[in-house]
């Protein structure tokens, strides 16, 4: 059995002062992650996720508790998707390929939740499509 050392709960300062901060405990409570990644990596992924989400909600004023919850949810799921991308690996065996495919499906599911949460936050419809 592998036991992870507890990760201290540090709050990650949002680069955008008008938007809420997100802590490591927020991330671990919101999405299914283990603590084996460590405080430094989790903090970095939260910060990268904040940058990604902040770019998508420019000029949006986040005031209410509902908006704060939705913002934190978007950041946490984006951070989880970034971690999932880092863990994506392929090898030449059948098991490695199926693990990689499962990770891709998980990553797409996490990003879908992010997109739905941002749509809810910005009062847009969820069924957006990208034109090629």
Which residues does each predicted region cover?
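Non-catalytic, well-ordered alpha-helical scaffold segments
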Residues: 47, 73-77
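Short loop/turn elements at secondary-structure junctions
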Residues: 77-132
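Conserved short "hinge" loops at termini or chain/domain junctions
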Residues: 1-66, 126-132
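Structural motif
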Residues: 64-74
């Amino acid at each position: 059995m592998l036991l992870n050392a507890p990760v201290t709960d540090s709050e990650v300062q949002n680069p955008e002062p008008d938007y809420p901060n997100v802590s490591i405990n927020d991330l671990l409570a919101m999405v299914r992650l283990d603590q084996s990644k460590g405080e430094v990596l989790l903090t970095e992924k939260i910060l990268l996720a904040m940058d990604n989400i902040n770019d998508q909600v420019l000029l949006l004023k986040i005031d209410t508790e509902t908006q704060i919850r939705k913002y934190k949810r978007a950041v946490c799921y984006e951070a989880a998707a970034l971690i999932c991308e880092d863990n994506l690996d392929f090898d030449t065996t059948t098991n490695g390929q199926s693990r990689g495919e499962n990770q891709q499906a998980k990553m797409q599911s996490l990003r879908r939740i992010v997109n739905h949460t941002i749509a809810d936050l910005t009062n847009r419809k969820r069924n957006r499509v990208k034109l090629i």
